[in-house]
Amino acid sequence: MVSSKDIIQRRALRVRRRIKMVSHDRPRLSVYRSNQNIYAQIIDDSRGCTLVSASTLEGDLKKSLKSGSDKQAAFAVGKLIAERAKKAGVNEVVFDRGAYVYHGRVKALAEAAREGGLNF
């Protein structure tokens, strides 16, 4: 019997496999969503390192947000990751939503990153 955890892992691997096919050596913007916070990082898979990261746990961002688990928080993290990526010289990324549906907080983060100047 297949558990729901196995189904989620398969979905995430399926998404990542598609990303590897179309990435063309671009770094990926990976999103992790917990019940309390949202995290984003830009990863260079060819070198195996994280270039830039942002989350709702960071001090200045945490103080300005009412909650770390709503769309406004995701939007703020998206803006912050785009700003840091531009400083690091990253303009084009591949969006890695993992096993999450492109809706709600994940969509808000992606739209904010696009508004901030990231292309994907």
UniProtKB/Swiss-Prot annotation:
Family: Belongs to the universal ribosomal protein uL18 family.
InterPro entries: Ribosomal_uL18_bac-type, Ribosomal_uL18_bac/euk
Keyword rRNA-binding: yes
Claim: rRNA-binding is one of the keywords in the record: yes
Subunit structure: Part of the 50S ribosomal subunit; part of the 5S rRNA/L5/L18/L25 subcomplex. Contacts the 5S and 23S rRNAs.
Pfam families tied to this protein: Ribosomal_L18p
Gene Ontology cellular-component annotations: cytosolic large ribosomal subunit
Keywords, ordered alphabetically: Ribonucleoprotein, Ribosomal protein, RNA-binding, rRNA-binding
A GO MF label: 5S rRNA binding
Gene source species: Bartonella quintana (strain Toulouse)
Protein name: Large ribosomal subunit protein uL18
Function: This is one of the proteins that bind and probably mediate the attachment of the 5S RNA into the large ribosomal subunit, where it forms part of the central protuberance.
GO BP field: translation
Gene3D superfamilies on file: 3.30.420.100
NCBIfam families: L18_bact (TIGR00060)
